[in-house]
Design a protein with these regions (language model features):
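Small-residue-rich hydrophobic transmembrane alpha-helices
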Residues: 44-104, 141-160, 271-335, 366-368
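Alpha-helical transmembrane segments of multi-pass membrane proteins
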Residues: 121-147, 346-368
């Protein structure tokens, strides 16, 4: 596809593969949560803290991908493919450093993080075993977020979606083996689930690299990974940092809430874990539409079509709010079958049911 065609594509044609991709991406942790919930409530509570720490770092990685997407889209819209390639390399290198630094923080301060979040004492060791292995996953995760964002900007949303699907299949198969002892292997519990996630993410990075550098014939230049243009990085950060601020505050809010809930015991913490994952899915429509909008508006601005970019932005906002309202209403009416499908613990279900009414008012406002 010629890059100028991207600006003239419909929002739906770009957003639905992005929706499926992010859905599958979030489904990795939800699959872990679902499978663990049928094994042990204690494991579920211990995993919840680790998942929230993981999501916090993912939010940090995403601010680079947002800035990267907009900058690349503008360069492609203006026909400056060399500049777009430079932005890709800088973003990959910067996110790799963020991922590596995050993994080091979890490795050395994992116990401190769990204690700050008031994790019940009998869950701390299981939580750390899960968290420190999941920390290794942050390195390929940081890289894959950038690679997938670059593919979307080039109009290859479906390719990123298929890669995430493959990674999820690998994770599910791995979970089945380590949790249920298939093929005569021992049951590894949370540690096995974490390693399954790591393997799935590494496979995703390999596939995404192949699609970006070989499929799109973008020349891989190692010099661009180590020699950065300060102006280019500043432009990416200038766009990405404000975009990440709201999501970062939202994740920190949940982590703070979890710290208080941790004082209440194992069952409330397990309930918070499930509600946190369900909340992420409620946001999916708005997230997918916003990313599709970023790509379209970036191409339009790069092509100097400012009026079209302005109109496109408000149409996307309207679509995002309407879709979110529709999804929240469906969630409300389906709350009982949803909860009974993901846990059999009646104590957790009783605590979760009243929270669904909050989502009816909270999620449409968050779409803005």
């Amino acid at each position: 596809m010629h890059q100028s065609d991207v600006a003239d594509r419909s929002l739906f044609s770009l957003s639905w593969p992005i929706f499926i991709d992010i859905f599958l991406h979030l489904a990795t942790l939800l699959i872990n949560t679902y499978m663990i919930s049928h094994v042990s409530t204690a494991y579920l509570a211990a995993m919840g803290v680790g998942n929230q720490v993981f999501d916090l770092f993912i939010t940090i990685f995403n601010f680079i991908s947002v800035g990267c997407s907009v900058v690349i889209a503008q360069y492609l819209g203006a026909g400056k493919r060399d500049k777009a390639s430079q932005a890709i390399h800088i973003s990959i290198a910067f996110n790799f450093l963020l991922g590596f630094s995050s993994a080091i923080i979890i490795l050395f301060f994992g116990y401190n993080i769990l204690n700050v979040m008031n994790t019940p004492e009998h869950l701390v060791q299981d939580g750390y075993n899960y968290l420190h292995i999941l920390g290794i996953c942050l390195i390929p995760e940081a890289i894959s977020i950038i690679l997938a964002a670059c593919l979307r900007v080039y109009g290859k949303s479906k390719a990123a979606m298929y890669v995430t699907l493959i990674a999820n299949i690998v994770t599910v198969i791995g979970n089945m083996i380590v949790l249920y002892g298939f093929f005569g292997l021992p049951q590894y519990g949370l540690v096995g689930v974490a390693w399954s996630t790591v393997v799935g993410r590494i496979i995703a990075v390999v596939l995404l690299c192949g699609l970006l550098f070989y499929g799109l014939r973008i020349k891989f230049d190692i010099r661009l990974l180590v020699i950065w243009s300060k102006n280019m990085l500043a432009k990416i950060l200038h766009i990405g940092l404000p975009a990440a601020g709201e999501n970062l505050v939202w994740i920190l809010h949940y982590m703070t809430a979890s710290a208080f809930i941790g004082l209440m015991g194992e069952v409330p913490l397990a309930a918070q874990t499930l509600y946190f994952q369900l909340s992420l899915f409620l946001m999916l429509f708005g997230i997918a539409i916003s990313i599709g909008n970023e790509i379209l508006v970036g191409h339009l601005v790069g092509a100097k079509r400012f009026d079209d970019a302005f109109t496109r932005g408000f149409k996307s906002l309207k679509a995002g709010v309407l879709f979110t309202i529709g999804v929240v209403i469906i969630y409300w009416f389906m709350r009982d079958p949803i909860l009974y499908s993901i846990t059999e613990d009646q104590r957790i279900i009783d605590q979760l049911l009243p929270l669904f009414i909050l989502s009816v008012f909270l999620e449409p406002g968050r779409t803005f």
